[in-house]
UniProtKB/Swiss-Prot annotation:
Residues 32-49, 90-144 are periplasmic. Keywords: Cell inner membrane, Cell membrane, Chaperone, Disulfide bond, Electron transport, Membrane, Oxidoreductase, Redox-active center, Transmembrane, Transmembrane helix, Transport. The gene is dsbB. GO terms for molecular function: electron transfer activity; protein-disulfide reductase activity. InterPro entries: DiS_bond_form_DsbB/BdbC, Disulphide_bond_form_DsbB, DsbB, DsbB-like_sf. This is Disulfide bond formation protein B. Required for disulfide bond formation in some periplasmic proteins. Acts by oxidizing the DsbA protein. Its main location: membrane. It is found in: Cell inner membrane. PANTHER family: DISULFIDE BOND FORMATION PROTEIN B. GO terms for cellular component: plasma membrane.
Length: 169
């Protein structure tokens, strides 16, 4: 086995690990929703979508036996992580600067109209407001933890893309 094959195998293993972590984070969100009754807001649901996209792209990337396929799916996973960073940062901002919502979030109809909200309403249906701040976990709010998780997902993906940019075959 040459060095390139060993590196590809390691890369694929790391993608599986990343996917499992993202699925565990969504599982944690569902635990908070159903057992601690912390209703998800539109930005929470969008963050779930981004975690699931990262997991899907990482699992698919781990199935490829060539650098070209792995790199393509790493790019898609990194873009999903960037989308998650933007969404989580917006959520942190909204909670730090609450406005007047009248009990309605403008994103709710959009998020609830997406097909997964109809297929799996228990996972993707909006039930809360983005301004609602739940008790912090280890000193950070849920949007802050989500932001940390997206950054932690993005950094290794970006480093991998830079480190392996010459591997095409």
């Amino acid at each position: 086995m040459n060095n390139d094959t060993a590196m590809l195998r390691r890369e694929r293993s790391l993608l599986v690990l990343l996917a499992l972590i993202c699925l565990a984070l969504v599982g944690g969100a569902l635990y908070l929703q159903y057992f601690l009754h912390e209703d998800p807001c539109p930005l929470c649901i969008i963050q779930r979508y981004f975690f699931l996209l990262i997991a899907i792209f990482a699992f698919l990337g781990a199935r490829f036996n060539s650098w070209r396929g792995v790199r393509l799916l790493e790019v898609l996973a990194a873009l999903s992580a960037l989308g998650g960073i933007v969404t989580a940062a917006r959520h942190v901002y909204v909670q730090a600067n609450p406005g007047f919502s009248c009990g309605f979030d403008a994103l709710q109809p959009l998020v609830d109209s997406l097909p997964p909200a109809h297929w799996l309403p228990g996972v993707f249906k909006v039930a809360g407001l983005c301004e609602t701040a739940y008790p912090p976990i280890l000193g950070l709010t849920l949007p802050q933890w989500s932001l940390v998780a997206f950054v932690i997902a993005f950094i290794p993906l970006a480093l991998s893309l830079v480190r392996n940019r010459r591997r095409i075959a």
